[in-house]
Amino acid sequence: MSYPTILEVVPGSAAAAAGLVVGDELVAVNGVLPSDVIEYQQLVDEPEVELVVRRSGLDLGLDIVKEPGAPLGLRLNSSIFDRVQTCDNHCEFCFIYQLPPGMRKSLYLKDDDYRLSFLYGNFTTLTRFTELDLARVVEERLGPLYVSIHATDPDVRSGMLRNPRGATSLRWLRALLDHDITVHGQIVLCPTINDGEVLAQTCAEILVRYPKLASVGIVPVGLSRFNQEKSLRIHTQAEAAADLDTIHFWQLIAEERLGRRMFFASDELYLTAGRPFPATEAYEEYTQHENGIGMARAFYDELDRLERGTPLLAPEVTGEWRTVPAAPA
C-alpha cells in the first residue's frame, strides 16, 4: 500500500493551522492507514484527529482539534490508497481495448472497483466482488452503485465478459438490493449478441429478479477505429428502432407493476433510429444523464426556457480583471 500524498492544503483550514504542507504523505489517521478516501473521510470527521505524516523521510505526529464533521482541509492525490481493483474481464466491446496506443498510462487502467462506482459512477460487473466487499457496502451504506448487467442469461453474460464468473456474479446484485442498497444498472447492446429476444428476456427477468433496481440504462455499443473485434458492429437504423420498441414495451410493463419506467434508452439509439427524443417526463429524474440518457432532451428544454424569455446575458457583471497563466504548450 502506498501512502496518499497531500496535493493541496486549504488556507485557513484545520490542516493548515496544524502545519501540514503539500507533499506530506499521510501515514495514519487515528492510528489507522485508511484504504481509500471513503474511510479517510469517516476518520477525519471526528473532532479530535491524530495524524502521522511523512515529510522528507521523517514521521511526524500531529494532534488536530476541530468541530465535529468540519473538513480537515486536505486534497489528496488519489481516491484509492491501497490498490484499485482491476478488471479481469475481457469484454469484446471494452472501450479500453479501443484506445489508440501511446497515450498516458492511466487511460489504460481497467477498473472493476465498487469504491470507484460509489465515488464516480463507474460501472462494475461485480465479478471480483466479495463477501467482505458486501459487508462493507451494507455497513457503510455505500450507494448508489452502478452495475453492468448486459444480459441476465448466464451464458450470454459470461460470453460477453469472457469470464466464467460473469455467469454467477449477478448474485451480488441481488444481495445488494436485498440490503436496500441503491443500484443503477446498464446494458450495452451489441447487435446479434444481446439485443432482440435476449434484450426482451433480460428486461423481463430484471423485473422479476431485481425489481428494486433504481434504473437500467440501455446504450448501444461504441466502436472506435482502433477496434480489433471484427465481429462487432454498430446498430443499423432498423435494429435501433426494434430495440427501442422492446425498451418502450418493457417501460410500460415496469410502470404498470412498479409505478416507474425503470428502463431508459440512450439518446444515441433515438438518433440512430431516426426517432424523436421522448418528452421530459419520460426520463423521470434523469438518473442516468451522465450515461448519455436524456442529455439531448435536457438541452432542448434549456433552449425552450431561453426562448420563453430567460435572458442570455447576465443583467450586471461585477468583479475585477485578473490574469490567468497560460497552460503549458
Q: What is each stretch, according to the model?
A:
Residues 244-329:
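Hard-cation-handling environments
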